[in-house]
């Protein structure tokens, strides 16, 4: 009888152990799932005043990627300085375009904050850790720009078919530049006027060291009625371009 009792007790103990293990496994899965949910970054709101200060500070703006999620037409009509365009309709498919900013500050905005809120959630769900939903252009009076902004990959793809306006210092231009590039001084409009083509629809891309001088050149060119002007945000300080030396 004692042997039988011991056997029954042993089986009961084993059953309890298995049950505990089973519950522990479920608990572990629940904790893992919860941890995964917690890993999704919190989207923060950013007021127009704060964005204005960022884009007006040449050094501080280097710490932020600003993304306009409105339509290309709305973007072309006027957008926040240094903002690239990633329309909400195709936003999810183009997240890789700013993949290198996954652990840096990304501000998304639209007209009212609704579409940019959707975009912000998409970024957070894709592992972006510092996402801000910026105040919309219909809620804050921004100094909007009409020239576009692109990144290094787009510059390299389009350079051969564009008039590339290099706003770096002459010595750096002479050391190496894009084959289709011309050198200008962004502080001297006369040097820009001298290289502008007659066709106002010509694709013109400006670039420099960090996007500041080139933005000034792009704004001036756009003010002269040119309709296809783009500034590259990624300058030679951020990207090592495959330059060549030429006659220009």
Question: In which residue ranges do the predicted regions lie?
Answer:
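Phosphate-rich cofactor/ligand-interacting catalytic cores and adjacent structured alpha/beta frameworks
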Residues: 68
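Rhodanese-like catalytic fold shared by cysteine-dependent sulfurtransferases
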Residues: 2-9, 18-64, 72-105, 111-163, ...
């Amino acid at each position: 009888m004692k042997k039988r009792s011991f056997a029954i007790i042993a089986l009961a103990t084993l059953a309890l152990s298995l049950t505990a293990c089973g519950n522990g496994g479920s608990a572990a899965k629940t904790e893992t799932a919860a941890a995964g949910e917690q890993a999704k970054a919190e989207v923060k709101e950013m007021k127009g005043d704060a964005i204005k200060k960022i884009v007006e500070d040449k050094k501080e703006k280097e710490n932020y990627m600003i993304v306009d999620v409105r339509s290309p037409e709305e973007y072309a009509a006027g957008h926040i300085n240094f903002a690239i365009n990633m329309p909400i309709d195709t936003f999810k498919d183009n997240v890789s375009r700013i993949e290198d900013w996954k652990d840096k500050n990304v501000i998304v905005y639209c007209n009212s904050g609704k579409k940019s809120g959707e975009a912000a959630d998409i970024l957070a769900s894709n592992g972006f850790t510092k996402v801000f939903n910026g105040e919309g252009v219909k809620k804050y009076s921004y100094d909007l720009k009409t020239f576009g902004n692109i990144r290094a990959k787009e510059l390299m793809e389009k350079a051969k078919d564009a008039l590339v306006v290099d706003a770096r210092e002459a010595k750096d231009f002479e050391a190496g530049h894009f084959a289709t590039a011309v050198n200008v001084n962004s502080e001297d409009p006369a040097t820009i006027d001298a290289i502008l083509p007659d066709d106002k629809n010509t694709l013109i891309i400006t670039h420099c060291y960090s996007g500041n001088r080139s933005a000034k050149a792009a704004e001036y060119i756009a003010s002269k009625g040119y309709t296809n002007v783009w500034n590259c945000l990624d300058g030679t300080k951020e990207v090592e371009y495959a330059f060549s030396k030429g006659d220009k």
